[in-house]
Amino acid sequence: MYPCSNPELVAAVSAAGGIGVLQPISLTYVHGHDFREGIRLMHELSGGKPLGMNALIEASSKTYRERMERWVDIALEEGVRFFVTSLGKPGWVVERVHAVGGLVYHDVTERKWADKGADSGVDGLIAVNRRAGGHAGGRSARELFDELADVGLPLICAGGIGDERAFVEALEIGYAGVQMGTRFIATEECRASQPYKQAILDAGEDDIVHTERITGVPVAVIRTPYIERMGLEAGPLARWMLRGRRRKHWMRTIYALRSLWQLKKASLDESGSKDYWQAGKSVAGIHAIEPAGEIVRRFAAAGRSISESPFPAVERPRDLRPGAG
């Protein structure tokens, strides 16, 4: 959840019984922590509850790949046993994590990526649907579940989960759980700016648009006057650069570096003057800034209210406590 996953938020989610997922670039670049010390801080704040780590594993840069490998190794040394991978082949992460008894779930938006993840040995899939913030998929939650159900792995619903009703609907479809981003930005612990949080509270589904101006591919953001002035499509030079194989590599690197700065600045800027605010359609169900733990507990209570599911139960994952293996 770059750039909003600060240590206090991640720890609060875990302390309440969820799995707070740290984002290493957010932890180090946005919030200024040494990676290892940041993990130790989150363990301390959460009371030693399980933490997860997001490993964006696209291999466009050798330097970035080496840094991500080091981050994964440090996280494992510090007892992290749950990893969410995205944008690449997760095999090397799976090998390292399974060696110590951990679990790897992989972000997917369609069947071909799910099959590649399964072939790499991942333990579950994060099914990113078209209601998600950031880089959303193209299918509804139900369509994606139906497409992935026979892969044979637990499925987590990502996108559109802003209130208990949406959470229960995901479980009733057959998902083993949900992943939430936008809902946790509008919390007391999140360090995102007040204008960003207020924009989430004020937005409806129709206020979520997809812009190519940040990363070169569509990203779900809140429609604002700034977004409307900038437009939603990448410029002609960028589109040309993204078409060639070699040019595409360099253009995506430029976009990645620029977007890190843009999103960091926009998320922390209290003036809201240049507001690239990532969010999904779950904004429709978010009406208050609340403690993260209260949200987790309320959703858990709603989940327990489902007395009987028409779908077979999914086997509970292995123990994810720090150090468990």
Question: Language model features by range: what are they?
Answer:
Residues 1-154:
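Active-site entrance/lid segments in N-terminal catalytic domains of soluble metabolic enzymes
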Residues 158:
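Short hydrophobic "strand-cap" motifs at the C-terminus of beta-strands
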Residues 140-154, 162-325:
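Conserved active-site-proximal phosphate/metal-binding subdomains
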